[in-house]
Amino acid sequence: MTQIHYGLAALLVFFAASAGAAASRCHGTVNRGSIEGSVRLPAEGANFTAYSTLAVAMGRNHVHSEVSAIILDAYAKLEGAAPGAQYVYGESGNEYGGRFRPHRTHQSGTSVDFFVPVRDKNGQPARLPTPATQRFGYDIEFDRDARYGEYRIDFAAMAEHLVQLDLAARARGHGIALVIFDTAYLPRLFATSHGAQLKRLNFMKAKPWVRHDEHYHVDFAVPCDR
């Protein structure tokens, strides 16, 4: 075999290995599962950032490859659909799934938390601060008026995000299995221009074990081996 042929063969092996590594395989359920070949969400993009550089360094931003594609497709569409809006994603899961303390779920690579998009005291889009002193944002408490200090929840930007996540998931043959968000805020979310579309999503009706006011939890309907 010539040197050129050896080179071509090596490239074919490389691309075959890369293609195989790119596809994740999840097992079980969100509260009792695992994953093979998970991928890490980017730490930041044009209109989004991770909630913590430390958490990213610890590998707490692993997801199923299909979930990653859905999230990134949605963020790309949001650059045009919600110009100026700033998004922050939260916890997702471990590299191999399984128990992900302190969460009860996030075990199969198909669950992701997203911090609420906000506007500052001047009404401008902003990123919600998520310092370690407040458990990387999870200890933040919004009041009944959806305010926290100088920030208020941007329900329009949140609605647009959920719609784009749903569209991106459907475009890839999947969907959204569940959304968990503080039920007291749902009327304001449904009052946005995307209210009718959002009402078709499966929002948790019961009270969750912890208040979901500073973030919304999304389970993606990506199939896993049972």
How should each PLM-predicted stretch be described?
Residues 1-8:
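Bacterial N-terminal signal peptides that target proteins for export
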Residues 70-101, 178-205:
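Extended, low-complexity, intrinsically disordered C-terminal regulatory tails
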Residues 14-19:
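N-terminal signal peptide c-region/cleavage motif recognized by signal peptidases
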